[in-house]
Amino acid sequence: MEIFWILLIPFLGTMLGAGTVFLMKNKIDKKIEKLLLGFASGVMIAASIWSLIQPSINMAEEQGKVAWVPASIGFMLGIVFLLILDSLIPHLHLKSDKPEGIQSKLKKTTMMVLAVTLHNIPEGMAVGVTFAGAIIGNAGITIAGAMALAIGIAIQNFPEGAIISMPLRSEGMSKSKAFFYGTLSGIVEPIGAIITILLTSSVVPILPYLLSFAAGAMIYVVVEELIPESQAGEHSNIGTIGVAIGFVIMMILDVALG
């Protein structure tokens, strides 16, 4: 039960971020948005390395496998998985009028929420598979280390929640409705985490693959969406600074608590 509440921490980050719609103006300043996008990227990159890929390598070594094989295969499968989802699920990215995925008649609002929801899937998997490793007691993953990842994801979810709810508000949606949709986009994280824990507890031999799989999926989101959006237009250096800050904070969290 205690772990269940910890799994809700990332979702809480999304909810608090979406809640900024009640406190701020209808639009986020472009410089702040770039900083937040860069920050989220930095957190996810650091989490992928220290909380997922490194434990994947360690666990593979403990299992007597060639350490780089599970990490490499799982990472590439994670990239391919998100690539397939990206091409199948109808969604619309922020600041874009061109929907991606299979053609549909879904509302613009729904497709915007689906875009963020799609990117939250690997984050939920990452938290779930890390807790599974901690529960099993392999790869040097501790509950504290898994909690560090959950906190890190929650921190980067805060700007994501704001970045989805604020544009919805600026398009005329009520604050309460914008908050609801912003929060809804993060619900897949605890669900994905719980499902991943239930699955990985019975498939210990492939846990190194699952750890690196989650890392690959997260890096896909960073490279495909977050970094390009943070670098578009003027003041791209602000996004770069955000990446550095997010990376260092997540690294400190993982080393201090892990």
Q: How does the language model describe each region?
A:
Residues 1-258:
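Intrinsically disordered, metal-sensing/regulatory segments
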